[in-house]
Amino acid sequence: MSVEGRFFNITELAKTLPETAETMLADLRLTDEQAASCRVFRVYRSVPAHYHTSCDEYLYVLTGRAEIVIADAPAREIRSGELVFFKKNTVHAVPRILEHPFTVLSVDTPRRPPDDVHFVNPADGTPQSFIKTYG
């Protein structure tokens, strides 16, 4: 039998992410199709400037507040209920978390492989220090 759709309680899934993490982010992959991947993630600390080469990214803030920097624009506060979009190869960073927990629903088009994280300053991190996937 083929499954035509799946349903997710995003609010409840976000609550299952750990309170603390050794990585900058922790995520749950909800879908992982070639055309797009969808995740819920929590940001635990500042995230240095980085980019992804494989996908455009849509970020919908579920809870909390943070500063985000996209390309050369000044830092801007984002909060629950806001959607952010940027194209592949766009440098972005989260210099400060203003309110915890800071959780986000992310849609990457096309799919973003977990190792597609490139720090502007390579000393700032690796794909392994960037994110841990749960579930």
Where are the predicted features?
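Structural motif
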Residues: 37, 58, 65-67, 91, ...
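A short, N-terminal "cap"/entry segment at the start of jelly-roll beta-barrel domains
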Residues: 1-41, 48-49, 120-135
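Short, conserved beta-strand element in jelly-roll/cupin
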Residues: 42-43, 52-68, 107-110
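A short beta-strand-loop-beta hairpin characteristic of the jelly-roll/cupin
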Residues: 58-80, 95, 117-119
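Short loop/turn positions at the edges of beta-strands in beta-sheet-rich folds
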Residues: 34, 53-55, 62, 72, ...
